[in-house]
Amino acid sequence: LAPAAMLAPVPEAVPTRRAVLAANMETALNISWDAAALPGERMLVVGAGVVGLLAAHLLARIPGVSLTVIDRDGGKRKVAEALGLAFATPEESPGEADLVVHASGTPEGLRFALAHAAVEARIVEASWFGDREVALPLGEAFHSRRLRLVSSQVGEVGGAMRGRRSRAERLALALSLLDDPRLDCLLDGPSAFDDLPATMARLAASPGVLCHVVLHHPDA
């Protein structure tokens, strides 16, 4: 059992099934704080995984922005559009952006982000590369365009909100932001925990699944 102090109540309006997105929404919220996005900016989110789509979902609410989600898997278009987001493959990219959020987890995605950043743009790196080394073209337009590469990591409260919001407050806000039925398009399943071996085999053959829900108690 976890100590009561470590628990966070799920808002009544948020179904248990959707609440599994809490950690991803908290990460997306932190990305938006690190991005320090402004009204009217041109934005790209590179990588249409759960975190990338949730970050785009939050950033697109800022007035006057033009935001496009970029992913090489054209099958992600349907999910992005279900969230009301513009989608493009790398070949269809609309051009340079003032803010680029990179969430593809690939070196190629980060290089794409750098190549599509406008003068004085910010590239927020939201991926996790572990101990892998990543080769980047920092000797080309990176200096002449005065680009800024910003690390975003959920272990600390991001940006100007650090010192003003606790981790508990950030999680509570993330949970409240899940009160949106459109987010159900990110979910697959559910499956029973006892069926997990067969479920994992099926998911391995279906790379387009974003977040599969597993129930420990089938009646939940």
Residue ranges and their predicted role:
Residues 1, 44, 68, 122-124, ...:
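Structural detector of well-ordered beta-strand residues that form the stable sheet scaffold
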Residues 1-8:
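Glycine-rich phosphate/adenylate-binding loop and adjacent beta-alpha elements
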Residues 12-90:
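Mid-domain Rossmann-like dinucleotide-binding core that forms the NAD(H)/NADP(H) cofactor-binding site
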Residues 20, 44, 48, 69-70, ...:
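Glycine- and other small-residue-rich loops at beta-strand/loop junctions that grip anionic moieties
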Residues 78, 83-150:
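Glycine-rich cofactor phosphate-binding loops and adjacent beta1-alpha1 units
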Residues 136-187:
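C-terminal substrate-binding/catalytic core of Rossmann-like NAD(P)-dependent dehydrogenases/reductases
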Residues 165-220:
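C-terminal hydrophobic helical "lid"/dimerization subdomain
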